[in-house]
């Protein structure tokens, strides 16, 4: 009998930039594409950080919604977890994306 597991992926993280890791997915489409690859390989939970166009960390609810919609479309059943972390951002900004009702948040 096998033991069920949850494999979590955090495709972007809060700190790295493309200059640190050229393959880092920072745009919405890159994040969706790389998350889909992980889903196809067996991942079942995606921990999401979003970025502004200049690659700085963001709490923009619209960016979170776009990534969430793409994951739901291309990775059916995958658990979507939004990051509410936000170095230097106020609490309201850090939780603004929760309006989009992810499966989880941390």
Predicted regions and their residues:
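Glycine-rich, proline-tolerant flexible connector loops at the mouths of alpha/beta enzymes
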Residues: 19, 44-67
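N-terminal small/glycine-rich loop or linker at the start of catalytic domains
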Residues: 1-23
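Extended substrate/RNA-proximal surfaces in nucleic-acid metabolism proteins
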Residues: 88-106
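A structural motif
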Residues: 40-43, 77, 102
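Glycine-rich anion/phosphate-binding loops
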Residues: 23-32, 62
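Active-site beta-loop-alpha junctions enriched in small/polar residues
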Residues: 10-14, 51-53, 83-87
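Alpha-helix-loop-beta-strand connector modules within alpha/beta enzyme cores
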Residues: 3, 9, 56-82
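Conserved, mostly hydrophobic/aromatic
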Residues: 31, 38, 49, 105
